[in-house]
């Protein structure tokens, strides 16, 4: 008898028990049997039950042909103990079942076990009757095991039916309170729960700056949670959305290299490079990245909130942390370890060492002295022209100097065009005169002042200026200053910067979030930008911006629409090695206490992906992770390591913006590096999410919550980690713990005073037979064992045989 497999989940054992007992009661053949000159109807022998149940279990998909006959006998014993069956005389509760001709029958009561649920409370006037009936049932049940009586069984059945009718009546009366949930209600609960968990993990007061709730598709979440393999990979019902078989074969070949190359594959030189190029071409030709264009802002914002893009804290004046309670959560971002370049570290130390009075006086001097501002503007113009003429090897890659060379501040006459990227900081500047322009210019860019040409940054931006960045009256201002990404400058951008014909766009959410976080902490955007763009090898190579400007200025306008989002490796051959070392990701970008936050947040975000995209991402991450860790993998690139090549090749097909000029490939590469290191945790299914949704749906069904957003649900799980021990220590603890428990059992037998002496001797002999070493350790000699039972009982003396008195004759 075949049946569908019971799905994994809570109460699976109870469901299996109910399925087997139901099948056994429904299919076990019953007939008349004769025993001890009596006939019994509707019964079966133990041997017949073993045969039939054995065939049932072997043909059941939940058990399989591995079931043995002895296991079937053990299951029948459990049936007898739990009153699924009883002997022909009505006795049950023991496990006296063997493969013989003993007769059994089915009881009148149902053997099914109810799943744990919250029954409605009975009415007050039925509580007393229920308690009396309950007591009587328990008493009759105990008696029925030994001396069953017909009137007792009849009474217990009547009481059970009475209670059953009362519960059914109560269910009917409370049926109004139990709501019928539609599919829309269930989907809304999924959306609500995952957003609440994401907000709690990130620790933000609102998700408005992170994700739009309309972007959350509950159907994708439910599918990704339910349809997974044993390894957690999504299983697609529609195979047309899956990877082609030749791509899967190629991925398996490289993931298991060289073990999978024992087939009839060719072994010519460069075979593995051709296979890798085939896989890369497939993923790069996909119509959209695996994380989709829609969720680009989500993943960028997650990294911003988690500290992936660090904004150092700099307090100034009266603007302290108490002005913004949320800023206290980001105190850890000011650690010296968060700076990935020497220049940014020195800049931060330079700001911290500056005196507050010097900063105030310098700011007042710059604002009040128009001549000083004009001189600074002219000097910055000269620096701009000078940076265009400097060769690629004379400029530090990704430093703040390159930010100056990206725009001509003197020639701008309209607002520049901000890009949709989290690393940009283009800000509309209020003001029409050159005084305001130079004032903001000093706050936004490095300033070269004095004979020594020191790099100077203002440590106190104006709070009023930062608060009025997005006001409507500032949109029409003709001047703007900002930052450009070093890897995405195009010919069109350069023409717009030179001709002053840039169009204004609304800042994207990730940029506004980064700007808001820097505003709260009175810090700068240029410092984290320089920190992220800075290469480890400052003195080597050149920036992609310089190379892009020199190589693309001579191109015609017909090539503007081409994909110009090139990495540092594609733009410059001289910067190949620094870029590859930059993308290796060997040094963690996140601080240790922020790594767990990023993993949990990305775990929830990856559940939002369409199932085909999530499956492809899982398989891709597994492949590149294995390849990067495989020491036997041949070199796939002449100048790059395997890990650097994986990150550089697949960064565009994982994270990409809809407008390709806005892609920050460095950020995408670092995200791929983080996914490679933690893909097993990020791409697994969180169990706590399913539990929270089930509890929330249960509350909704019982009418405790009218809307999904009105109530509370289960709190987040608390993680506790145990100290890992070696295998040898585990084996030692296993043996010692087991022996200690057995020795404790022996002591309990010895000290049990309620146990009769004869029964105690019997148990001790049985214990000595099973565990002789432990018994000998407790009783090393026979004297110690004899002392346990105390003095031997005195033997009664035999009655004295008295001589019968002889009666004298009366004669």
Swiss-Prot record:
Keywords: GTPase activation, Nucleus, Phosphoprotein, Repressor, Transcription, Transcription regulation. GO terms for cellular component: nucleus; transcription repressor complex. Disulfide bonds: none annotated. Expressed in testis. Up-regulated in bladder cancer cells (at protein level). Residues 598-653 are annotated as: Interaction with ZNF224. Coiled coil: none annotated. Residues 24-108 form the DEP domain. It holds the Pfam family DEP. The keyword Nucleus applies. The modification Phosphoserine is found at residue 512. It comes from the Eukaryota. The keyword Kinase does not apply. GO terms for biological process: intracellular signal transduction; negative regulation of DNA-templated transcription. Residues 281-321 form the Rho-GAP domain. InterPro entries: DEP_dom, Rho_GTPase_activation_prot, WH-like_DNA-bd_sf, WH_DNA-bd_sf. GO terms for molecular function: GTPase activator activity. It is found in: Nucleus. Isoform 2 and isoform 5 can form homodimers and heterodimers. Interacts with ZNF224. May be involved in transcriptional regulation as a transcriptional corepressor. The DEPDC1A-ZNF224 complex may play a critical role in bladder carcinogenesis by repressing the transcription of the A20 gene, leading to transport of NF-KB protein into the nucleus, resulting in suppression of apoptosis of bladder cancer cells. This is DEP domain-containing protein 1A.
């Amino acid at each position: 008898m075949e049946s569908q497999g019971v799905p994994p989940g809570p109460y699976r054992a109870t469901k299996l028990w109910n399925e087997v007992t139901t099948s056994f009661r429904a299919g076990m053949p019953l007939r008349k049997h004769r025993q001890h000159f009596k006939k019994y109807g509707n019964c079966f022998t133990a041997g017949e039950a073993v045969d039939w149940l054995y065939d049932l279990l072997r043909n059941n998909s939940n058990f399989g042909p591995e079931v043995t006959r002895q296991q079937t006998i053990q299951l029948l014993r459990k049936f007898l103990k739990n009153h699924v069956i009883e002997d022909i005389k009505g006795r049950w509760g023991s496990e006296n079942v063997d493969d013989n001709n003993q007769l059994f029958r089915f009881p009148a009561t149902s053997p099914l076990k109810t799943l744990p649920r919250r029954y409605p409370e009975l009415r007050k006037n039925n509580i007393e009757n229920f308690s009396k009936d309950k007591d009587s049932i328990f008493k009759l049940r105990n008696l029925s095991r030994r001396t069953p009586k017909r009137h007792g069984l009849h009474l217990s059945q009547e009481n059970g039916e009475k209670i059953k009718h009362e519960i059914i009546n109560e269910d009917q009366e409370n049926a109004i309170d139990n709501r019928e949930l539609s599919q829309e209600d269930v989907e809304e609960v999924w959306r609500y729960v995952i957003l609440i968990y994401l907000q709690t993990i990130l620790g933000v007061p609102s998700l408005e700056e992170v994700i739009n709730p309309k972007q959350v598709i509950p159907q994708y979440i439910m599918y990704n949670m339910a349809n997974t393999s044993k390894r957690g990979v999504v299983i697609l019902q529609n195979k047309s959305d899956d990877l082609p078989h030749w791509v899967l074969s190629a991925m398996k070949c490289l993931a298991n290299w060289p073990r999978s190359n024992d087939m009839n594959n060719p072994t010519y030189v460069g075979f593995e490079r051709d296979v890798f190029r085939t896989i890369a071409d497939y993923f790069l030709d996909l119509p959209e990245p695996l994380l989709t264009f829609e969720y680009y802002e989500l993943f960028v914002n997650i990294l911003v909130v988690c500290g992936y893009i660090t904004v150092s804290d700099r307090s100034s004046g009266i603007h302290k942390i108490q002005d913004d309670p949320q800023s206290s959560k980001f105190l850890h971002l000011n650690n010296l370890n968060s700076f990935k370049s020497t220049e940014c570290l020195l800049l931060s130390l330079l700001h911290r060492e500056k005196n507050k009075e010097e900063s105030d006086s310098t700011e007042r001097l710059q604002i009040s002295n128009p001549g000083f501002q004009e001189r600074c503007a002219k000097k910055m113009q000269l620096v701009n022209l000078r940076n265009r003429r400097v060769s690629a090897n004379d400029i530090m890659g990704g430093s703040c100097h390159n930010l100056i060379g990206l725009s001509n501040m003197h020639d701008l006459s309209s607002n520049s065009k901000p890009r949709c990227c989290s690393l940009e900081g283009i800000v509309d500047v209020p003001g029409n005169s050159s005084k305001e322009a130079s004032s903001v210019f000093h706050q936004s860019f490095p300033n070269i002042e004095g004979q020594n040409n020191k790099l100077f940054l203002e440590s106190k931006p104006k709070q009023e200026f930062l608060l009025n960045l997005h006001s409507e009256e500032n949109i029409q201002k003709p001047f703007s200053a900002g930052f450009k990404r070093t890897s995405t400058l195009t010919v069109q951008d350069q023409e717009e910067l030179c001709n002053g014909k840039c169009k204004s766009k609304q800042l994207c959410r990730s940029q506004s979030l980064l700007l808001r976080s820097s505003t709260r902490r009175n810090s700068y955007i240029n410092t984290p930008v320089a920190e992220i763009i800075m290469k480890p090898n400052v003195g080597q190579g050149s920036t992609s911006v310089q190379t892009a400007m020199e190589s693309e200025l001579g191109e015609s306008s017909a090539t503007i629409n081409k994909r110009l989002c090139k990495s540092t490796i594609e733009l410059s051959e001289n910067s190949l090695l620094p870029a590859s070392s930059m993308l290796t990701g060997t040094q963690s970008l996140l601080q240790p206490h922020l790594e767990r936050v990023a993993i949990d947040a990305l775990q929830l975000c990856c559940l939002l992906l369409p199932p085909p995209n999530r499956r492809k991402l899982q398989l891709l991450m597994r492949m590149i992770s294995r390849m990067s860790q495989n020491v036997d993998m041949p070199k796939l690139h002449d100048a790059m390591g395997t890990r650097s090549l994986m990150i550089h090749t697949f960064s565009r097909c994982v994270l990409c913006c809809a407008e390709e000029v806005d892609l920050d490939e460095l950020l995408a590469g670092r995200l791929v590096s983080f996914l490679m290191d933690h893909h097993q945790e990020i791409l697994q299914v969180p169990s706590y999410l399913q539990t929270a949704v089930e509890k929330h749906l249960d509350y909704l069904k019982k009418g405790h919550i009218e809307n999904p957003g009105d109530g509370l649900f289960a709190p987040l799980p608390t993680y506790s980690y145990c100290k890992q021990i070696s295998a040898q220590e585990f084996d030692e603890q296993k043996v010692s713990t087991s022996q200690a428990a057995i020795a404790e059992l022996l002591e309990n037998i010895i000290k049990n005073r309620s146990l009769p002496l004869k029964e105690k001797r019997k148990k001790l002999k049985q214990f000595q037979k099973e565990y002789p070493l432990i018994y000998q350790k407790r009783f090393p000699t026979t004297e110690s064992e004899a002392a346990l039972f105390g003095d031997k009982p005195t033997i009664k003396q035999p009655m004295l045989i008295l001589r019968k008195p002889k009666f004298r004759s009366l004669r």
